[in-house]
Amino acid sequence: MTRKLFGTDGVRGTANTHPMTAEMALRLGAAAGRYFRPVGAGSPRVVIGKDTRLSGYMLENALTAGLTSTGMNVLLLGPVPTPAVGFLTRSMRAALGVMISASHNPHEDNGIKFFGPDGFKLSDEAEAEIEAILAGEIQPAQPGNIGRAKRIEDGRGRYQEYCKTTFPSGLRLDGLKVVIDCANGAAYRAAPEVLWELGAEVIPVGVEPNGKNINLRCGSTHPEAAAEAVRAHGADVGICLDGDADRVIILDETGKEADGDQIMALFAARWADEGRLRDGTLVATVMSNLGLERFLGARGLRLERTPVGDRYVVEAMRRGGWNLGGEQSGHIVMTDFATTGDGLLAGLQFLAAMAQTGRRASDLARSFETVPQLLQNVRYAAGQEPLKAPGVQAVIRDAEVRLNGAGRLLIRKSGTEPLIRVMAECEDEALLRDVVEEIVAAVRDAA
């Protein structure tokens, strides 16, 4: 059974355009409700969270209508981080969790992703079954079994209190000046409050959402404003989240960025020293830098690579029993604490390292020298398959021959946008540029 509607991170699209319409959200809610509440079953609960996009109101109401039509009782959380939905699904014994968000995308986009009762994102197989239900006639509940919906006020507070329990007991952030950039997104209240309650002096950025400014010149994909705040306020560190707070980028005291690879390297080394890194293994995607792999190997640790997407990182971690993984983009998954990437929890672990060692952020955020890496994205028209073009395939084969033994090449379609991502790594930067530019030109000609 294959998926057509679901991508690597749920269903995404432009708001009010298929599939992100009220009509589709209603049917998707009904299909998910029927999947999680077989005909004749009781009235299980669903938790629904969202980020701060204007279209979230529309999709929230449509999903609620679809879910209640199949007998599910809906608890509306309001704006909360994606990892909060995973946490609350499990802690509140819900049968299903739903997050309405397009993560780091602009406000015009939105998305819907589902969490199972264990708090983990659904498998490809479960999503395919929901699509199959969606394609048919969805049987509604009997009139007396229609579900109820209510808004709950303490969901965010429950998550915030849990976040604080993951911080080392007895450790405080007193005297530490922290810039926190919430991307005008889902964590705009939770993240500053948690940091302040742990003792930090907090300088908030991106905490004035208006429905249209999520990820706009702020957050993990646009950390310039946070970097300027770090320098202007003489802050010790900056933490940049994306719109749904499931990814993080760290800024040192000079405003310089550390991506997910550097964060994972620090955590892996520290956890290995403390005997906490299970089986000496870190799980990361094919996009992670070759320098990370070399750093781990020099310490007798292993890198397990997966396809791109934090869900595939989590699936590999669960299969192998490993407890640390993530993506270069800033998804950091720590299954000792959470069921999905959690930018705030990862930020807290970085701050704990600073507080425990007394070292500066710049010392901790540079664990290894990166191998030169070049990534370019090429947009293509709907219905096109540029990677199947003979000319593109010939250029790719030539690039593989030229890089053989000297570097690494990765070309893939984005799972969330109509983009071809062309990435290469090589110590020879001239060769690196030539290879990527030739492939990009060929893909553009075919797109």
UniProtKB/Swiss-Prot annotation:
Annotated binding of Mg(2+), by residue: 103, 242, 244, 246
Cofactor remark from the record: Binds 1 Mg(2+) ion per subunit.
Superkingdom per UniProt: Bacteria
Entry-annotated residues carrying Phosphoserine: 103
The reaction(s) this protein catalyses: alpha-D-glucosamine 1-phosphate = D-glucosamine 6-phosphate
Membrane-crossing segments per the record: none
List of catalytic residues: 103 (phosphoserine intermediate)
UniProt xrefs under SUPFAM superfamilies: Phosphoglucomutase, C-terminal domain (SSF55957), Phosphoglucomutase, first 3 domains (SSF53738)
PTM entry text: Activated by phosphorylation.
EC top class named in words: isomerase
Cofactor: Mg(2+)
Keywords recorded for this protein, A-Z: Isomerase, Magnesium, Metal-binding, Phosphoprotein
Gene Ontology BP term (one): UDP-N-acetylglucosamine biosynthetic process
GO CC entries: cytosol
Gene Ontology molecular-function annotations: magnesium ion binding; phosphoglucosamine mutase activity; phosphomannomutase activity
Protein EC: 5.4.2.10
Function per UniProt: Catalyzes the conversion of glucosamine-6-phosphate to glucosamine-1-phosphate.
Similarity remark: Belongs to the phosphohexose mutase family.
HAMAP family membership: GlmM_B
Record protein name field: Phosphoglucosamine mutase
